[in-house]
């Protein structure tokens, strides 16, 4: 096989082409072996993925976590073999047996790429469009990171300068989340982001003419992106030279994200399956796989054929990666020498440590005063923001309501934005009314590393964010969601804005910790605990959702046990508790008032505040039993939402004061009264439970 380059701009040899074709047959074989999967896109995209991994990206397969690396996101996650074949060829740790085990129990090659499971996979993708927003978040994080550590460096000269590459398919760009994120990227002028669109005109139901007719390239131009179209080769295959040249041109446009439309033919060069919807999501069949191998010059009788010459050639990526990293290390060391204080800060942040004495900055709120927990959260953020520079975030256009602004004078916006507070390295992110992409961008920001991000909206709009929140949990990402206006207590905006099912629904997501503090002091402790729990170590981190009130609620003495998720806020007087009242958030003060009535009538009553069911469940059985004694069968849970969470805690004799229907437009106090969230009703329900327990 000739190794002589065929052009001067891109060194591309016959051996490179053989490696691309090897990736194609590996994709076809892997799907054929397991009997299911998505071969077509992996076959047609092989030249683009190979060009990125072997010719373009700065990365070191031996150190997939290298800070200076370029990032790659496969938004079209169903085409996971596009990524797996390149990870194998480049030497990231996958071997041929891993490709043979594609989509099987315990393999390193699951059906869709999973972060933390396979080395070299930067994010979990599969739900279409999520990866586009993840990539936008990574590009945002790269800019903020540069602002933390090297803001004065000339463009392209900082060790913190790198690119984010994303491959997206037709489906990704049909999803609304990609429109939200792409609009954000254009507005932010993210010149470090390059998106390659696999324009193959095929979806599951056939040609994309079934559902789409707009000019996608013009749409991206309207978003403010730099756009290019590249034509395929005369035979229909993707042209590596055109891809390489387009990427090089994109890199030079530093004030816009770049969109490269690649017209492709799905499953190329399969003689019968190419350009058909059948090639999208099912095995080609033995005959078609054999026919494809003949077209490409492979032995149709062999499966998973990789020559020593090919793997020897592609594994040179390890040498190039080591050289690139060594070169980067020089510039990084020079930066460290010239910036010792920033270098110390970088070391602290990259270890996930917080500044010495940060906890002392947390506000302590005076008991008795009525403070909305959203307002308390805002005070906490402003206090912590002063000492934790890596903490940044914003809101989906509800900053004044969510109380999510650390610094009103510093907005994360391009330098030429007309607003006076615009700063490319600003503290406050204006996500816009784009809740779904906000959540996925926060995932990308967190995956990128070296910052801590939060984002806010109303709790009811967490529905818009749900798939991205689920992926936060699936990836164990320490993202913080600030969800305010958390119940009917928000009042007159009515049932469209009043969360009812949301708390229970969010608690149903495995790995998401929902925290609903009772008052200002619990809110401060919640933020402290969330920050202490922050870790990027896979499997140990977790996203948190803070559910905060619009309305003022009484402030109680701070109790450190709030960090354990549930604790005895007020103990029974006059003997062992006969009844336990369990409440969260704004309903805790209702339970406290009900306790006073019960105590006055001679019923020793304990009040348990349970800001986080998930944190409480982490505690040992002894602690949980000390809070909720098994011997006390009379229990009442009080929460202004559906009661699904509480059945396991109240037991057979227990009762739940909940809301099993939508709310109404009226003052929040009126709604609490009309729907039974009063001390009188809770006390009456407690007596019912007591009677049931004594039967």
Which residue stretches match the model-derived regions?
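Thiamine diphosphate
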Residues: 2-163, 314-318, 322-543, 547, ...
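Short beta-strands and strand-loop turn motifs
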Residues: 166, 196-199, 482-483
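Residue-level marker for buried hydrophobic side chains located in beta-strands
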Residues: 166-167, 195, 394, 516, ...
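Intrinsically disordered, low-complexity segments enriched in small/flexible residues
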Residues: 170, 279, 365-366
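Short acidic, Gly/Ser-rich segments with clustered Asp/Glu that frequently serve as metal-coordination loops
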Residues: 171-177
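Non-catalytic, alpha-helical, charged scaffold/linker segments
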Residues: 293-298, 303-324
């Amino acid at each position: 096989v000739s190794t002589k380059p065929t052009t001067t701009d891109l060194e591309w040899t016959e051996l490179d082409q053989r490696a691309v074709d090897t990736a194609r047959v590996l994709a076809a074989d892997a799907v054929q072996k397991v009997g299911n999967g998505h071969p077509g896109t992996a076959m047609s995209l092989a030249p683009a993925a190979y060009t990125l991994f072997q010719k373009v990206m700065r990365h070191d397969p031996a150190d997939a976590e290298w800070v200076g690396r370029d990032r790659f996101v496969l938004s079209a996650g169903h085409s996971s073999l596009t990524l797996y074949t390149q990870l194998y060829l480049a030497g990231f740790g996958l071997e041929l047996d891993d490709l043979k085990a594609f989509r099987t129990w315990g393999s390193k090659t699951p059906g869709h790429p999973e972060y933390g499971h396979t080395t070299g996979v930067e994010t979990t993708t599969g739900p279409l469009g999520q990866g586009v927003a993840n990539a936008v978040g990574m590009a945002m994080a790269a800019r903020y990171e540069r602002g933390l550590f090297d803001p004065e460096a000339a463009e392209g000269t900082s060790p913190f300068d790198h690119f984010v590459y994303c491959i997206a398919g037709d489906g990704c760009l049909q999803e609304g989340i990609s429109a939200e994120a792409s609009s954000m990227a254009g507005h932010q002028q993210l010149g470090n982001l390059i998106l390659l669109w696999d324009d193959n005109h095929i979806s599951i139901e056939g040609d994309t003419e079934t559902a789409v007719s707009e000019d996608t390239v013009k749409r991206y131009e309207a978003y403010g992106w730099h756009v290019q179209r590249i034509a395929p080769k005369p035979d229909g295959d993707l042209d590596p030279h055109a891809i390489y040249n387009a990427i090089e041109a994109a890199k030079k446009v530093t004030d816009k994200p770049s969109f490269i439309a690649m017209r492709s033919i799905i499953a190329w060069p399969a003689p019968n399956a190419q350009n058909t919807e059948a090639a999208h999501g099912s095995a080609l069949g033995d005959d078609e796989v054999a026919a494809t191998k003949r077209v490409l010059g492979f032995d149709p009788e062999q499966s998973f054929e990789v020559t020593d010459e090919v793997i020897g050639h592609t594994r040179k990526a390890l040498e190039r990666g080591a050289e690139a990293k060594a070169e980067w290390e020089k510039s990084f060391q020079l930066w460290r020498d010239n910036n010792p204080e920033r270098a110390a800060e970088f070391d602290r942040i990259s270890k996930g440590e917080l500044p010495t004495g940060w906890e002392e900055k947390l506000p302590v709120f005076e008991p008795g005063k009525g403070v909305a927990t959203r307002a308390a959260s805002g005070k906490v953020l402003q206090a912590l923001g002063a000492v934790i520079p890596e903490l940044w975030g914003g809101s989906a256009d509800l900053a004044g309501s969510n109380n999510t602004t650390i610094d009103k004078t510093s907005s994360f916006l391009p330098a030429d934005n007309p607003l006076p507070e615009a700063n490319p390295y600003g503290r406050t992110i204006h996500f816009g009314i784009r809740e779904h992409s906000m959540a996925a961008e926060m995932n990308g920001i967190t995956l990128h590393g070296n910052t801590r991000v939060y984002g806010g909206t109303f709790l009811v709009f967490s529905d818009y964010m749900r798939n991205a929140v689920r992926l936060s949990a699936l990836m164990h990402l320490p993202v913080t969601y600030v969800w305010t206006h958390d119940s009917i207590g928000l009042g007159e905006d009515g049932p469209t804005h009043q969360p009812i099912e949301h708390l229970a629904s969010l608690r149903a997501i495995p790995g998401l910790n929902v925290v609903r503090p009772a008052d200002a002091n619990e809110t401060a402790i919640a933020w402290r605990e969330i920050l202490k729990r922050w870790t990027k170590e896979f499997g140990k981190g977790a996203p948190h959702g803070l559910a905060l009130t619009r309305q003022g609620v009484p402030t109680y003495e701070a109790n450190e046990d709030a960090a354990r998720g549930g604790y005895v806020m007020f103990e029974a007087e006059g003997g062992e508790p006969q009844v336990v009242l369990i409440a969260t958030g704004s309903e805790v003060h209702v339970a406290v008032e009900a306790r006073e009535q019960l105590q006055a009538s001679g019923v020793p009553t304990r009040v348990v505040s349970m800001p986080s069911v998930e944190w409480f469940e982490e505690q040992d059985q002894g602690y949980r039993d000390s809070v909720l004694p098994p011997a006390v069968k009379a229990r009442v849970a009080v929460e202004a939402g559906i009661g699904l969470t509480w059945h396991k805690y109240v037991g057979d004799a227990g009762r739940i004061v909940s809301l099993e229907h939508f709310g109404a437009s009226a003052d929040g106090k009126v709604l609490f009264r009309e729907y039974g969230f009063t001390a009188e009703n809770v006390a009456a329900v407690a007596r019912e439970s007591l009677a049931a327990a004594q039967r």
